[in-house]
C-alpha cells in the first residue's frame, strides 16, 4: 500500500466522498479548476489520485477512520 504524505491526507480529507471512487472523482473535478500558477497543488492532487487508485476499498475505509474524530 502506498504511503500518503500529510499534505495528501489533508487534501483527501477536504474532498472525501462516501467511497474511494467518489473521492477520486471529487479530486478530479477540483483539479479542473487549478490554474497553471498552482503547479504544486496540481502535482499534489495528481499524486493523491494515483495513490488512491493503488489501494483497495478496505484500505481506503481504514484510512478514513483516521480522518474521523
Predicted regions and their residues:
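N-terminal acidic leader/helix
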Residues: 1-28
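Short acidic DE-rich linear segments
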Residues: 1-2, 62-69
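A generic structural signal for solvent-exposed, polar alpha-helical segments
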Residues: 10, 21, 39, 66-67
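Hydrophobic residues in alpha-helical segments
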Residues: 16, 31, 52-53
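Short secondary-structure subsegments characteristic of cysteine-rich extracellular domains
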Residues: 28-34
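Short, charge-rich amphipathic interface segments used for partner binding and complex assembly
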Residues: 35-65
Amino acid at each position: 500500500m502506498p504511503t500518503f504524505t500529510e499534505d495528501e491526507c489533508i487534501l483527501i480529507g477536504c474532498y472525501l466522498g462516501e467511497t474511494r471512487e467518489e473521492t477520486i472523482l471529487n479530486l478530479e473535478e477540483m483539479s479542473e479548476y487549478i490554474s497553471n500558477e498552482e503547479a504544486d497543488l496540481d502535482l499534489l492532487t495528481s499524486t493523491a489520485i494515483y495513490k488512491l487508485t493503488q489501494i483497495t476499498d478496505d484500505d481506503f475505509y481504514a484510512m478514513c477512520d483516521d480522518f474521523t474524530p
